[in-house]
From Swiss-Prot:
Annotated signal peptide: none
Subcellular compartments: Cytoplasm
Gene name, Swiss-Prot/TrEMBL: asnS1
Chemical reaction(s) catalysed: tRNA(Asn) + L-asparagine + ATP = L-asparaginyl-tRNA(Asn) + AMP + diphosphate + H(+)
One Gene Ontology term from the biological process aspect of the record: asparaginyl-tRNA aminoacylation
Keyword Aminoacyl-tRNA synthetase: yes
Protein name: Asparagine--tRNA ligase 1
Any one of the GO CC terms: cytoplasm
First-listed, main subcellular location of the protein, grouped into a coarse class: cytoplasm
Species this chain originates from: Lactiplantibacillus plantarum (strain ATCC BAA-793 / NCIMB 8826 / WCFS1) (Lactobacillus plantarum)
EC number annotated for this UniProt entry: 6.1.1.22
Keyword tags: Aminoacyl-tRNA synthetase, ATP-binding, Cytoplasm, Ligase, Nucleotide-binding, Protein biosynthesis
Subunit composition and interactions: Homodimer.
Length: 431
């Protein structure tokens, strides 16, 4: 008799197997019991008959509490009525770990209660489906970039400078020096691009933002490619190809998870159609003003403006060439306009706003020094970064994509906290 995982049930129809499971739920009519069993790979139904198990064993089985762990032995049968397509006719079982008063029951719970019990909530069907989609997106990220000749480099988490030049930093003592939890791996990524041509960093980043919006976490994962010898137009092509690739990967490999989340696949499929529309910041301002928005040139867009623009185009949309005053110091100046930089944000529809921000990077040593000084930065902190412009600088571009924002859009979640295993937010660092 073989020990299998539920996900492989199709390969063992009409065979007797053994599976290690947790009991998610159960119901019994007195002579027959239906048990929802999960093993981490999938969930399906186990069926136990009183006249086959015997009265004592049947009573013990039907008395088991939610989240009891056990070995079950039985025969796999195809079942077209089951969402999974298969069920287990249980002939034997062995309790491994008991469970008493499991706090997350089928009834509704408030979000604070669920987050306090996140270590257990991950077992429930919706969080479980989201984490599986997260895993698929991460897998597809590596596949996308590896297939295109990118090298992954690992940027440090502890840094002595801030790439965005902000004050939203987690500060710590580093043997008598000030150090910060990284907000971005981008500057190190640029160094990597000068060594390897095309690179990506992918890891946790930290923002000490005292924000309670549905789009912010204090710790999140960010994907940041940097590409030498590449201008902005070419970078935009990489960005839209990436989004379409990741969306298609989820459609192809996570149909059950999308069904659990009630995510419409046809809508997702529409978002894989390329190219994405492009609109200049100037034209976006004009469009917003024509539709009743009180916005002036030079402001950064908030959630209402981003939502309108993406819904107007009914697709992810690139907004190009933002005002220099609202963008980071490292962005390439526009060739004909002093007030604009060659930057772009990708806005997702359905109210999710910016999911990618990118730009062509400045290659001008003196311009970068001027921008750093204007933002109040200490040039000594950035000496190594400025060195990149002194020794064979080339045109290069890059972008950043927040994994959790992307996942919130793909899985249609109201808050990014749903898309990371253990969210870190203002006033929440437990569990």
């Amino acid at each position: 008799m073989e020990t299998i995982s539920i996900i492989n049930a199709a390969d063992h129809v009409n065979e007797q197997v053994k599976i290690g499971v947790w009991l998610s739920n159960k119901r019994s009519s007195g002579k027959i019991a239906f048990l929802q069993l999960r093993d981490g790979t999938a969930t399906f139904q186990g069926v136990a008959l009183k006249n086959e198990l015997g009265e004592t064993a049947f009573a013990q089985l039907t008395d088991l509490a939610q989240e009891t762990s056990l070995w079950v032995t039985g025969t796999i049968h195809a079942d077209t009525r089951s969402p999974f397509g298969y069920e287990l006719a249980i002939s034997q079982f062995e309790v491994v770990g008991t469970s008493h008063d499991y706090p997350i029951t089928p009834k509704d719970h408030g979000i604070d209660f669920l987050l306090d019990h996140r270590h257990l909530w991950l077992r429930s069907s919706r969080p479980n489906a989201i984490m599986r989609i997260r895993n698929e997106v991460i897998r597809a990220v590596y596949e996308f970039f590896n297939d295109r000749g990118f090298i992954k480099i690992d940027a440090p988490i502890l840094t002595g400078s801030a790439p965005e030049g902000t004050t939203e930093l987690f500060k710590t003592d580093y043997f008598g020096q000030d150090a910060y939890l990284s907000q971005s791996g981008q500057l190190y990524g640029e160094a990597g691009a000068m060594a390897f041509g095309k690179i990506f960093t992918f890891g946790p980043t930290f923002r000490a933002e005292k924000s309670k919006t549905r789009r912010h976490l204090t710790e999140f994962w960010q994907l940041e490619p940097e590409m030498a010898w590449m201008h902005q137009d070419e970078s935009l092509e990489v960005q839209e190809q990436l989004v379409a690739y990741l969306g298609q990967a989820v459609i192809d490999h996570c149909p059950h998870e999308l069904a659990v989340l009630d995510r419409d696949v046809a809508t997702l499929q529409k978002y894989t159609k390329l190219p994405f529309p492009r609109v200049s910041y100037d034209d976006a301002i004009t469009l917003l003003q024509a539709n009743g928005f009180d916005v002036d040139w030079g402001v950064d867009f908030g959630s209402p403006e981003e939502t309108f623009l993406a819904e107007h185009f009914d697709q992810p949309v690139f907004v190009l060439n933002y005002p220099k005053a609202i963008k980071a110091f490292y962005m390439q100046a526009h060739p004909t306009r002093d007030d604009v930089v060659i930057a772009a944000d990708l806005l997702a529809p359905e109210g999710y706003g910016e999911i990618i921000g990118g730009s062509e990077r400045s290659t001008d040593y003196d311009y970068l020094k001027e921008r750093l000084l204007a933002s109040g930065q200490d040039l000594q902190d950035y000496e190594w970064y400025l060195d990149l412009r002194k020794y064979g600088s080339v045109p290069h571009s890059g972008f950043g994509m927040g994994l959790e924002r992307f996942l919130a859009w793909i899985t249609l979640q109201d808050h990014v906290r749903e898309t990371i295993p253990f969210p870190r937010m203002l006033h929440r660092i437990y569990p």
